[in-house]
Every structure is written in structure tokens, then in C-alpha cells.
Amino acid sequence: FTWDMNYPPADRVEGLILWNGFVRGPKAAPGEYFAKFKSGSDSVEVGFAILGDPNYKTTNADYEEQVNFLLTVRDKFTEVMKALKNIKEVRQQLTDFNARIGKDIPNEIKLKIDTINKQITAVEESLHQTKAKSGQDVLNYPIRLDDKLASVYNAASAGNTTPSRQAKEAYAELAAQTDAALTKLKKIVEED
């Protein structure tokens, strides 16, 4: 077993095209850690330390602040990925239902399905650039919230320092927009 000292990465949706890439897990901050090894009914716990890069004058508190911020951004990115998966599932359920009923579907139900599809598509398009089918498409179409969150993550993870004020402000704005979109999706799924 080898640990690369990184936290687990964010969830991802296969096939998505992102300009800024997917969000990986941040590297653990310097400090004291324990590893527990198990084999059958035997186990042993071993302590170890992660040391900061001596080329930087970064304090352990600064490293902790960076890691905590990166975990927050990673978790918000994961929420977006889960929402995109949920949208695909809802869309598939609507398609399956429509196919089962076929031509006999009452007009009122067909209109409701169309309305829900339009609503979830609007949320999906705010979360992800759905027109991006290749790496170059993101040059032609604006990036959306998932890609913007990945950009903030990348900026804040560069170097061994606390996140900049700009990164924190950008994240706060993006998190508010993301939460609004996720709230819309939740309302659509639960009420419609």
C-alpha cells in the first residue's frame, strides 16, 4: 500500500469536458498522523509525521487553512457532479416513462414531462457547459460553475500558502450560485 498523502478526489462524471480539469484531493497538511494496518485479526497502528517544504516559510496553520479551503471547494465540486448524475437519472426516468406509455400518454402528462425536462436542462446548463463535446469546444462556449470551481481549486492549490483573498471571494460567489442551482434542482425533483 502506498499513500500519496492526498485526500480523495472529488466525484466526477465520466465523459465531461472541463477546461480546468477535475478536482483532485488536496495534499495533507504537515503534522502528526497515524496509519493503521490490518491483516486478518491482527492490526498495528504506527505514527508518522508529514513535514512542510523547508523551502517555504509556510506555517502549519497556513497549510491547514489551505487544505481546509481546498476540501471545501472539492466538496462543492462533488455536489455539482452528484447533481449532474441526478439530472441524468431523472431525464432517463422521464424518457423510460414516456417510452412505456407511448402514444397513449395524456397530453397533460406529456406537457409536464416536457416542462420538467426544460427545467432540469436549465439547471444542468448552469452547472456544466453541455455544448462541450471536445477539449476545444470550451474555447467556443463559456465555462460554467463546475469548471469555474475547478479553476478556483487549481489557483488555491498552487504553491504552499493560504488561499488568496480573491480565491476566497470567487469561491463564495460561485458557491452561492451553485447552491441556488442545486436548490432549484431539489425543488424540481421533490415537487414536480
Where are these regions (language model features)?
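Active-site-proximal structural scaffolding
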Residues: P26-P30, S41
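Mature extracytoplasmic or organellar-lumen-exposed domains after removal of signal/transit peptides
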Residues: E32, F48, E79-D192
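Generic recognition of flexible, low-complexity loop/linker segments
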Residues: G21-R24, F34-K38
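Short acidic/polar inter-strand loop motif in beta-rich domains
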Residues: Y7-V13, K38-V46
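Glycine-centered tight-turn motifs at strand-turn-strand junctions
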Residues: F1-P26
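Low-complexity, Pro/Ser/Thr- and charge-rich linker/hinge segments at domain boundaries
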Residues: E45-M81
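Generic beta-strand/beta-sheet core signal
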Residues: D4-N6, K36-K38, L51
